[in-house]
């Protein structure tokens, strides 16, 4: 084989490699664009609410008034998944402080495609109270988060569309508009900035029935915990009242083997220290 043929072969090889690389990049880009809005939201739910088989964290909630006065809620949050991602879940929360919520517990049985079951144990009156489905949009223990914000909203309850793709800071995001199919919530639609890399929601904007911006959620800090990108600090602001809630997750862990027996009315009243400390 002469020198010209060898050079020609090398050139063809380089061209083929370059074309293969371009094809791979194009395929990756097209695969992202091929995602429907529902698929993006589902991936976001999985990344935000379903990572690991189970989850535990100590949570500090700082409730801050328009004037700057602060109240602190401290609790332990536990969560266990049942079945495939996007399926049933159970949540258990135990409150340490302040005094008016000390020893209070909250439990959720989350179901796909039907209303979740929620219970609240109030130690002051030694009573377990069931949270009605219509109360899912009410304030969670006086914070700017709702009960539904804590455990997630069923994907099928909203109509979703990708309205644009843009950067939020350094992150490439899908911007999803989610419009409730029923008028049983206090907002008309929500815009979500969802990271294209890890699919975590980085920002949510809630618009009220008049179409005015009413609440804003921001993921302020993301850390890797056992290989799971985890939002460890999040803020919800109520633009109408000027109130905001800053939530920090500390001592976070995944796949610790939470027992099924924890999620019972018995342990709502007497939570085991093994899981709450």
What is each model feature region?
Residues 152-158, 165:
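Surface-exposed beta-loop interaction hotspot
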Residues 96, 107-109, 117-121, 127-131, ...:
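Gly/Pro-enriched, hydrophobic low-complexity segments
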Residues 1-31:
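Short, basic, low-complexity termini and linkers enriched in Ser/Thr/Gly/Pro
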Residues 266-276:
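Short, low-complexity, Pro/Ser/Thr/Gly-rich segments in the mature regions of secreted, periplasmic
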Residues 76-83, 161-167, 220-222:
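Short amphipathic beta-strand and strand-loop transition segments with alternating hydrophobic
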Residues 86, 101, 112-113, 158, ...:
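Short solvent-exposed loop/turn micro-motifs enriched in small/polar/acidic residues
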């Amino acid at each position: 084989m002469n020198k010209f043929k060898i050079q020609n072969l090398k050139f063809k090889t380089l061209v083929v490699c370059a074309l293969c690389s371009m094809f791979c990049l194009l395929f990756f880009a097209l695969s992202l664009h091929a995602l429907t809005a529902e698929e993006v939201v589902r991936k976001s739910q999985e990344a935000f609410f379903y990572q690991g088989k189970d989850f535990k964290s100590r949570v500090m909630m700082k409730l801050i008034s328009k004037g700057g006065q602060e109240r602190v809620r401290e609790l332990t949050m536990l969560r266990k998944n049942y079945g495939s991602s996007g399926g049933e879940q159970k949540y258990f929360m135990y409150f340490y402080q302040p005094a008016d919520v000390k020893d209070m517990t909250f439990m959720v049985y989350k179901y796909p495609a039907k209303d979740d079951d929620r219970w609240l144990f109030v130690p002051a009156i030694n009573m377990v109270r069931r949270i009605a489905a219509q109360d899912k949009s009410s304030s969670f223990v006086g914070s700017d988060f709702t009960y539904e914000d804590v455990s997630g909203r069923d994907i099928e309850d909203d109509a979703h569309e990708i309205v644009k793709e843009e950067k939020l800071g350094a992150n490439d995001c899908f911007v999803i508009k989610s419009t409730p199919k029923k008028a049983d919530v206090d907002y008309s639609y929500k815009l979500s900035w969802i990271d294209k890399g890890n699919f975590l929601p980085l920002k949510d904007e809630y618009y009220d029935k008049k179409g005015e911006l009413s609440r804003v959620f921001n993921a302020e800090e993301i850390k890797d915990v056992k290989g799971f990108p985890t939002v460890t600090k999040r803020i919800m602001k109520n633009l109408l009242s000027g109130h905001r809630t800053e939530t920090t997750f500390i001592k976070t862990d995944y796949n610790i083997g939470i027992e099924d027996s924890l999620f019972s009315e018995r342990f709502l009243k007497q939570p085991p220290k093994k899981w709450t400390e």
